[in-house]
């Protein structure tokens, strides 16, 4: 991701099994690390105490007394129609990105294929698709931040999109919706069903799905020239 005109500060944060890559214009590594650790610990603690949060492949009721990040995960899972853990990584990325965006004008937080992007201008995000070569999406401007979840090759749900990108109002929702798309791609007529799904999930801004020689676009996705 190419983002900043100034020389950016880039650093990595390892939080247990998650490796986050952060790009900003400011030295905020300590703040980012604290936010990532707090988010991971809250989600992990809740998952250990509530097995259904960890194991369910379907949405579960939003728990009123749970930490805010747990409620956000459950709400995203309900919207996307998937189990809560499909939004775990996106939730951590979201929390770190939104925390930093309070005081930093442009920031990118990435973990695997999940991105939080806050930018005042248009930028390109590269989505890799194996031997066919990469494809680039135009993202921004999104001053408050936007979530993008991408997958190349075998997806988490066992489907095999050549490339997948979901844009949403938050990374936690993008992560959950990407899992929903992957589940549909394993069915007959999966590409068309996946595009219909992306159009109807509240908060999803758009998506790109490539399967074999076919490409599908839903919503406000702009391909770079």
Where is each model-derived feature located?
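Mature catalytic core of soluble alpha/beta enzymes
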Residues: 1-11, 17-225
């Amino acid at each position: 991701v190419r983002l900043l005109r100034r020389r950016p500060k880039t650093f990595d944060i390892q939080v247990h099994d998650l490796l986050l890559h952060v790009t900003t214009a400011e030295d905020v590594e300590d703040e980012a690390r604290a936010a990532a650790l707090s988010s991971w610990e809250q989600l992990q603690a809740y998952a250990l105490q509530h097995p259904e949060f960890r194991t369910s492949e379907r949405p579960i009721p939003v728990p009123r007394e749970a930490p805010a990040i747990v409620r956000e995960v459950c709400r995203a899972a309900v919207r996307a129609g998937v189990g809560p853990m499909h939004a775990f990584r996106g939730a951590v990325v979201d929390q770190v990105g939104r925390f930093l965006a309070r005081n930093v004008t442009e920031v990118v937080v990435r973990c695997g294929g999940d991105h939080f992007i806050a930018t005042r201008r248009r930028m390109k995000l590269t989505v890799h698709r194996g031997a066919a070569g990469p494809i680039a999406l135009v993202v921004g401007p999104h001053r408050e931040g936007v979530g993008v979840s991408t997958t190349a090759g075998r997806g988490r749900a066992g489907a095999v999109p050549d490339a997948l990108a979901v844009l949403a109002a938050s990374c936690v929702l993008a992560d959950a919706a990407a899992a929903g798309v992957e589940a549909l791609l394993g069915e007959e007529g999966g590409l068309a069903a996946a595009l219909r799904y992306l159009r109807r999930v509240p908060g999803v801004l758009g998506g790109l799905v490539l399967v074999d020689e076919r490409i599908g676009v839903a919503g406000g996705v702009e391909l770079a020239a």
